[in-house]
C-alpha cells in the first residue's frame, strides 16, 4: 500500500489570502484617491467603481460567507466612514 502525499494546505491558504490582499489594496488605493479628490461627484464615481471591481473579484474568489464578511469589514465600513467625513467637512 502506497501513501500519496496531498498538499491541500498550500492551495487553500493562498486562495484564502488572495481576496484579503486584493481587498486591502483596492481599499487603500480608493481611500487615497478619495482624499485627494475634492469634487463630490468625482469621488463618488471613483468609490462606486472601485467597490464594484472588488465585489466582482471577491465573488469569484471566495465562498458566500467570506464574501459577505469581507465586504462588510473591509469595503463598506471604511467607505461609509470616509463618505460621512467628507460630507461633514464640506458643510
Curated annotation (Swiss-Prot):
One Pfam family linked to the record: Papilloma_E5
Name of this chain's protein: Probable protein E5A
Keywords assigned: Early protein
Species in which this protein is naturally found: Human papillomavirus type 6a
Family: Belongs to the papillomaviridae E5A protein family.
Superkingdom of this protein's organism: Viruses
InterPro entries registered for this protein in UniProt: Papilloma_E5_alpha
Amino acid at each position: 500500500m502506497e501513501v500519496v502525499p496531498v498538499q491541500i494546505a498550500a492551495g487553500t491558504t493562498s486562495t484564502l489570502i488572495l481576496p484579503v490582499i486584493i481587498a486591502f489594496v483596492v481599499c487603500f488605493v480608493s481611500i487615497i484617491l478619495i482624499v485627494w479628490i475634492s469634487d463630490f461627484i468625482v469621488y463618488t464615481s471613483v468609490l462606486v467603481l472601485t467597490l464594484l471591481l472588488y465585489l466582482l473579484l471577491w465573488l469569484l474568489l471566495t465562498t458566500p460567507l467570506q464574501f459577505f464578511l469581507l465586504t462588510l469589514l473591509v469595503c463598506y465600513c471604511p467607505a461609509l466612514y470616509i463618505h460621512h467625513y467628507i460630507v461633514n467637512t464640506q458643510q
